[in-house]
């Protein structure tokens, strides 16, 4: 990015008025939350790619690997293991993993909705500036006020939409991973119950 490009961005930010600062804050909160959420769902590597190994791991939990291994060890440890106890422990795992992702998704979707709404606030401010310019009558000062109001109205709306769209894609990626994790937990629970209680 050249110095001229940076200057152009700075000019757009200035022309957008005070609402651009609010949009900058919304963008910062949205992208930090979405990035942290993506890291959270990807880091766990909680998927069924090693499903063929699950039965062996359930029989010998100490050999189980990764996050799947941690969940297996947690859900089957203890002498008096029962289907109800496994269910309860899986509910605890879901409470930690799935509910945590859901809370993050609520924040992300709220910020996605806030970005274009904040942009519309700038649009209203810009239109008011345009009306002030029109009310002032003719002349250079009046035309400058109208031009400034038009820039503010357009730049803030555009910026709000530009902030929201990538956030929406990030939200969809987090939601897709969340559903995959939930599905993997259900499959793992079924595999543990089937393996541990197949003789019952």
Outline where the language-model segments fall.
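Residue-level signature of catalytic and energy-coupling elements of molecular machines
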Residues: 17, 31, 72, 119, ...
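Membrane-interfacial helix-loop-helix connectors in multipass membrane proteins
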Residues: 133-147
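Hydrophobic alpha-helical transmembrane segments of polytopic membrane proteins
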Residues: 151-169
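Lipid-exposed faces of alpha-helical membrane segments in multi-pass integral membrane proteins
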Residues: 22-35, 111-121, 163
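Hydrophobic membrane-targeting segments
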Residues: 2-52
């Amino acid at each position: 990015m050249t110095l001229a490009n940076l200057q152009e961005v700075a000019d757009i930010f200035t022309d957008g008025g005070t609402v651009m600062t609010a949009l900058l804050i919304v963008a910062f909160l949205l992208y930090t939350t979405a990035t942290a959420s993506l890291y959270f769902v990807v880091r766990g590597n909680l998927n069924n790619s090693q499903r063929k190994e699950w039965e062996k791991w359930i029989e010998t939990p100490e050999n189980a690997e990764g996050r799947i291994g941690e969940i297996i060890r947690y859900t089957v440890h203890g002498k008096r293991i029962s289907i109800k106890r496994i269910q309860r422990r899986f509910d605890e795992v879901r409470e930690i993993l799935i509910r945590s992702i859901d809370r993050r998704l609520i924040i992300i979707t709220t910020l996605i909705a806030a970005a274009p709404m904040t942009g519309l606030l700038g649009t209203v401010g810009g239109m008011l500036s345009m009306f002030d310019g029109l009310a002032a009558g003719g002349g250079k000062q009046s035309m400058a006020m109208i031009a400034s109001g038009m820039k503010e109205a357009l730049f803030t709306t555009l910026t709000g939409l530009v902030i929201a769209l990538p956030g929406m894609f990030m939200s969809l990626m987090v939601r897709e991973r969340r559903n995959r994790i939930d599905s993997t937990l259900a499959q793992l629970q079924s595999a543990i119950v089937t393996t541990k209680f197949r003789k019952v």
